[in-house]
Amino acid sequence: MTDTLLALSTDHCRITPLFADDARALAAITDETVTSRVHFLPAPFTEADARALMAGSGGGDVFHAVRDARGLDLNGVIGVHRRVGQEYEIGYWFAARVRGKGIATEAVRAVVEALAASRPGCSIVAECHPDNERSRALLRRIGFVSTGRAGKRPGRMLMAWRAAPAYRIDVC
């Protein structure tokens, strides 16, 4: 999964590689609300920065475009980053216009599930600032739990994904 996903589709989005033509749209959705929370993004984030990010995508750091259901409008970015051994980190940001509409939850869940299916036994983690309540809530909705450990980035806490069991036991 350190290679770009060829294609993933959900009910409301398509997840594809980022293309060179995406530079302007990527710069547009990467506003101050994003750059203030993502430590490696410069502010302001320009088209040149977008091109540099896309040029560096590959190998251990892969950035995926989250597009609308038609596959046209860029609504967000999901990064998959290989860490040590069989550990992968996910990160994401979404355009202000789609926040609060469930698009991020749907897209991040799809990527995490595809990653887990393609890498049996891998560990999937995310780092989240404790004050970023919306991001923490998204991660919890899709199965991430707090590890109680600090992340590698300043002020971040490490969360780990736990697959939902394939069965359920009801006790009456």
Annotated model-derived regions:
Residues M1-S36, F63-C172:
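Acyl-donor (CoA/ACP) binding surface of acyl/acetyltransferases
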Residues M54-A65:
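A short helix-loop-beta-strand connector motif used in the catalytic cores of GNAT acetyltransferases and
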